[in-house]
Amino acid sequence: MKEQIFDIIETISGTDEFREDLDMDLFEEGILDSMRAIMLIVELEGAFDISLPPSEMDREDWNTANKIAARVQEKTDEN
């Protein structure tokens, strides 16, 4: 599952730079911005049949690839 999530992040961001450091702040490094974050949410919801309401997500909860993977795993476990 993690690899699929990382592939989606790579597709949305257009870079695999984050794979070198999965705890890299994706927003600070310019890998994600608000528009790409929304695109990422839409892709993750479709790929994993989960709901990720933006109102439930603080930027600090979604700023690294590891945190994104953990949140998606959490949501899939709820289903």
From Swiss-Prot:
Pathway: Cell wall biogenesis; lipoteichoic acid biosynthesis. The modification O-(pantetheine 4'-phosphoryl)serine is found at residue 34. This is D-alanyl carrier protein. Gene3D superfamilies: ACP-like. The keyword Metal-binding does not apply. Residues 1-76 form the Carrier domain. Its main location: cytoplasm. GO terms for cellular component: cytoplasm. One of its GO terms (biological process) is cell wall organization. Carrier protein involved in the D-alanylation of lipoteichoic acid (LTA). The loading of thioester-linked D-alanine onto DltC is catalyzed by D-alanine--D-alanyl carrier protein ligase DltA. The DltC-carried D-alanyl group is further transferred to cell membrane phosphatidylglycerol (PG) by forming an ester bond, probably catalyzed by DltD. D-alanylation of LTA plays an important role in modulating the properties of the cell wall in Gram-positive bacteria, influencing the net charge of the cell wall. Keywords: Cell wall biogenesis/degradation, Cytoplasm, Phosphopantetheine, Phosphoprotein. One of its GO terms (molecular function) is D-alanyl carrier activity. It is found in: Cytoplasm. The gene is dltC. PROSITE patterns: CARRIER. Belongs to the DltC family. 4'-phosphopantetheine is transferred from CoA to a specific serine of apo-DCP. InterPro entries: ACP-like_sf, DltC, PP-bd_ACP.
